[in-house]
């Protein structure tokens, strides 16, 4: 394939080249919806060829899956680290609020990319949607740990409902431009939503 760009390419080892492509893809998918991102643009930003992108990630959807998987792992790692930093004696309400604040920070760093699959689920990559669904189960498990809840179907309905509320509220926040002065209200609303759902389910909790 004939090169369409004439920028000199830096020689990198395979792991460095893969990381450079992934970095470029992360920035591209953070700035635009999936359909608006091209492999050619990612390759050019990474100083690589389209053939190399396909060699490392097989396809555009494979590249997107890698970005989504990395983002999920980063969010969970940051949330666990923030919770650990609070200490085991921290109030449950504070621990939950902190996890929400971490989520808001992650969203504010790439609002377009975060919101795209929520605004148009039909345009999402099925494999990436599967990653998000499995991640939601991991978030539910994390919430159980924060709240000290046993596995219970009714309580899990409340936890899933809370995550749905949080995403819907955050989507509205993104639409408003992610104003930082609204973060406190979002955190308070989300905590209250979960507390209310658990109350309605008859689940004893420590958010009161």
Identify the function of each model-found stretch:
Residues 69-75:
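Short, basic, alpha-helical segments at the C-terminal edge of helix-turn-helix-like DNA-binding modules
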Residues 35-36, 56:
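Flexible coil/turn residues that form the inter-helical turn or adjacent wing/linker of helix-turn-helix
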Residues 1-32, 39-45, 62-65, 87:
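Basic, helix-initiating cap at the start of DNA-binding domains
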Residues 76, 125-149, 153-161, 168, ...:
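Amphipathic alpha-helical packing segments from all-alpha helical-bundle domains
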Residues 46-57:
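Short hydrophobic/aromatic patch on the recognition helix
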Residues 106-127, 144, 168-175:
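Amphipathic alpha-helical segments used for helix-helix packing
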Residues 66, 80-109, 162, 184-187:
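Hydrophobic alpha-helical connector segments
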């Amino acid at each position: 394939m004939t090169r369409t760009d004439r920028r000199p390419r830096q020689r990198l080892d395979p792991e460095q080249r893969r990381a450079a492509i992934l970095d470029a893809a992360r920035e591209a998918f953070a700035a635009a919806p999936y359909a608006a991102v091209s492999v050619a643009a990612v390759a050019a930003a990474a100083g690589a060829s389209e053939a190399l992108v396909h060699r490392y990630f097989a396809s555009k959807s494979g590249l997107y899956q890698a970005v989504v998987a990395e983002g999920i792992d980063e969010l969970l790692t940051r949330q666990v680290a923030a919770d650990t930093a609070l200490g085991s004696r921290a109030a449950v309400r504070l621990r939950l609020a902190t996890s929400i604040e971490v989520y808001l920070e992650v969203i504010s760093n790439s609002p377009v990319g975060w919101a795209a699959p929520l605004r148009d689920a039909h345009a999402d990559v099925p494999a990436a949607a599967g990653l998000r669904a499995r991640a939601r189960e991991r978030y539910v498990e994390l919430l159980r740990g924060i709240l000290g809840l046993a596995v219970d179907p009714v309580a899990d309905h409340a936890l899933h409902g809370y995550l749905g509320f949080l995403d819907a509220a955050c989507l509205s926040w993104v639409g408003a431009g992610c104003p930082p002065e609204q973060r406190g209200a979002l955190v308070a609303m989300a905590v209250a939503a979960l507390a209310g759902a658990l109350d309605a389910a008859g689940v004893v909790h420590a958010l009161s």
